[in-house]
């Protein structure tokens, strides 16, 4: 069979893949919450996968000059902060393999650390949910101000 269809299921070792039909956009978050691991593509799905608090693999859209791999590596470095080195390595190897740099043989290392990666994903989602956009923007502008020699005071005065 050349093409997988909704309802098909495949397995190899501990990996089980279920081909699901497309769902309405309104139900996409529910689908992400229901899966053990999510494979996502595109920025909107990437953000939603982070909010879902489940391990995910980001298949980033290719860009000219390989810029997409720089974005992927930058995000992985940030996302993997706080993970034990072996778990960070397993996640990074699978993400890179899935995006064409390396092999997908990294699956076994990833799968062995699935419980730890699940906890990390939940913690990441909690940190994202706990941040206040207005306060984050203020912190950002304070940092920019420091770099440029400005000081932001109460009342928004420079």
Residue ranges and their predicted role:
Residues 2-22:
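Nucleotide-activated donor-binding/catalytic signature segment of Leloir-type glycosyltransferases, i.e.
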Residues 12, 50-56, 114-119:
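Short acidic (Asp/Glu) and glycine-rich catalytic loops that position anionic groups and cofactors
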Residues 17-29, 89-90:
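Short charge-dense sequence patches
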Residues 24-71:
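A donor-sugar binding/catalytic signature common to diverse glycosyltransferases
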Residues 55-101:
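Nucleotide-sugar donor-binding patch of glycosyltransferase catalytic domains
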């Amino acid at each position: 069979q050349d093409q997988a269809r909704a309802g098909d299921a495949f397995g190899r070792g501990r990996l089980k893949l279920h081909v699901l039909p497309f769902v309405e956009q309104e139900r996409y978050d529910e689908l992400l919450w229901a899966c053990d691991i999510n494979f996502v593509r595109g920025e909107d799905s990437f953000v939603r996968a982070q909010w879902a608090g489940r391990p995910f693999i980001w298949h980033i859209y290719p860009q000219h000059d390989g810029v997409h791999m720089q974005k992927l590596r930058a995000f992985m470095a940030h996302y993997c902060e706080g993970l034990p080195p072996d778990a960070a390595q397993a996640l990074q190897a699978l993400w890179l393999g899935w995006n064409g740099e390396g092999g997908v043989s990294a699956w076994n290392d990833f799968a062995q650390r699935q419980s730890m990666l699940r906890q990390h994903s939940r913690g990441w989602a909690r940190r994202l949910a706990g941040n206040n956009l207005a306060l984050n923007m203020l912190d950002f502008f304070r940092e920019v101000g420091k770099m440029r020699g400005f000081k932001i005071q109460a009342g928004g005065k420079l």
